[in-house]
């Protein structure tokens, strides 16, 4: 996974379902951003386009496995990162991790397909942090979202949650706790939780 170059500040957003990559590329060209790198999608890989903006590195990635497109902006200056991210948001519809957490914490609960997409989105948003082992600041909303989703009555939601926790717990420690607490409980995804608990036992 390519994550661009050295950074002091970083912001990540996902593109909305109907965002047009061509519009983003046109906006980048219009702002004079220099195309920095591109990789061709292959099996299990991501298609990526990168630009060098004024004081910032902008990386667009299509995370095919998770069904999301991500833009990560890094730079030494918080202002430069904010400016480049603002240009992205002006060009195309975006979704932030805050938006995804809102879906997972909604009352009444969101539809299962929306919850699964939100869980996959959180995985995509943290994909570089997971690759680099870069721990993230504590955010209690993540644990609250896990607590909510692990008790969902639909198996596919719990499976998506367990897969997300498996990715994220290295950079957001403690997310596995609500899952492991249900290892002996009956439920539609008991086997999924048992398998995850066994993985944690082996890893620990």
Task: Set out the residue ranges of the language-model regions.
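Short Lys/Arg-enriched alpha/beta "domain-start" segment
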Residues: 1-59, 63-65, 80
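Surface-facing alpha-helical segments and adjacent helix-coil boundary elements at the starts of domains
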Residues: 43-105
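Amphipathic alpha-helical scaffolding segments comprising HEAT/armadillo-like alpha-solenoid repeats
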Residues: 94-106, 128-149, 172-183
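HEAT-repeat alpha-solenoid elements in large eukaryotic scaffold proteins
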Residues: 108-125
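Hydrophobic core positions within HEAT/HEAT-like alpha-solenoid repeats
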Residues: 116-120, 161-163, 194
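Structural signature of alpha-helical solenoid repeat scaffolds
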Residues: 120-127, 166-167, 198
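Eukaryotic acidic, Ser/Thr-rich intrinsically disordered low-complexity regions
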Residues: 179-204
